[in-house]
Amino acid sequence: MGLVTPLQFYGMDINPFAVELAKVTLTIAKKVAIDKLNLTEQELPLDTLDNNIVCKDALFTPWVKAEAIIGNPPFLGGKHMRLNLGDEYVEQVFKQFPNVKDVDFCSYWFRLAQDNIDKTGRVGLVATNSISQGKSRKATLDYITDNKGHIHEAISTQPWSGEAKVHVSIVNWSYEQPQQYFLDDKEVSLINSSLQPHIDVSSAKTLQANCNKCFQGVIPVGKDFIVTEKQVKEWITKNNKNEQVLKLFSMGSNLAKNINGKPNRWIIDFNNLNLEDASDYKLPFEHIKNFVKPERDKNRDKKTREYWWKYGAKRPAMRKALAGLSSYFVVPRVSKWAIFVPAPFNWLPGDLNVVLALEDYYVLGILTSNIHRLWVQAQSSTLKGDTRYTNTTCFETFPFPQPSRKGEQPFAPTDNVIQQIRNKTIELHEYRTQQMEKKQWGITQLYNEYFHEPASKLYQLHQELDKLVMQAYGFQAEDDILSELLKLNFELAEKEKQGEKVIGAEAPKR
């Protein structure tokens, strides 16, 4: 007799065809096993699997306690659940899982698997790679590790072979602590809940010294706020007052692909103007009334419907922080390299931009260094192969060099080092600008070509900048940079808690 039979398998699906297909597959598998393994059990009668593989919703049906759980839960971002599943169903889910909201739909399966696995069993699930990030991570992989689970094998990210154009993570875990850990097919010493082999920086604290400096750009809510350059020229020619509400609109793609990141789109921006004042800009206002308002009238949000000429998210805090600056620094929210670049004050950043309301090239140098890159890679979220830079997890938690640290041995970057970082960053910026204009490339192509080439000027400038930033922190080559940064983050958070002043995104003063 075989040690495993179809009657030991259980499963659920809301698709009746998938349920029947699973039953047939198990029946065929039994026949194949008998033939290949020369088993003595009888092929007939067929096993009745109607009580094993059932057409039910796994989120609302008790699971059988199992020794092994495998599955491919549905991929659906938390923000899309209501649109795809309906309000009534989503409210039922929230009622069933009152402490788990705004997460990827597959997160609920991870929690149920953790709750229903045998103490000696194992689980293996596939999910979008956002499962190791933000709220989804807290609801799933943190839940597993906080409840005595051990992630023993995982693929952190790989393209999904199915229809969904996403990257996925594969996670295997158990209650029993493993002897070996394998991450991305390599043996590692451990796997944390961020699906990384090194120190987990997700516990880093928000530093108040970094707050109100870094922002996500505006969200118009209406594609027809965007207009052509031809329209802009015509409207300004007819009334130059219109120039006040017509702005170059910075998207993530222009920052990555265009020379110097220059936007190639224009947008109408009435900001906080009331209806009467907005209508004084006749041609732009008529355009919004004719093309944006009909779509806004269908919007579920009352405020969005009533204030149809205004953006869904105007970002007043960002605008206030940018007021008076001649330029600022900006990075695409999703990109391969996550490089901050200078932007003139008259670019209006969209929501695919993360904006730093500062002009000091010393700060840009710190954020351009490998030290910050390591932090971003450890903190950032991804959906495909690119890096998602967030103003909260990547920037507000990041500890900048301080006037004094390391206990009995006060350390501070000298004025000379601070100025050298500024100068080197300006040199790097000027070099990149010259190369982009010469080659007609965007910054992504420039970095793709030269960042990893030791003989390139780009590589050499980054190496020189990294050495200066290491000096600013007082780090040594043998230091575990992430560990040191996390330690510094905790130190600064504790100082802030005690009412002490710490240095955020600015040059320390001796």
Predicted feature descriptions by range:
Residues 5-8, 167, 350, 394:
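Exposed loop/turn and edge beta-strand positions of beta-sandwich/beta-sheet ligand-binding modules
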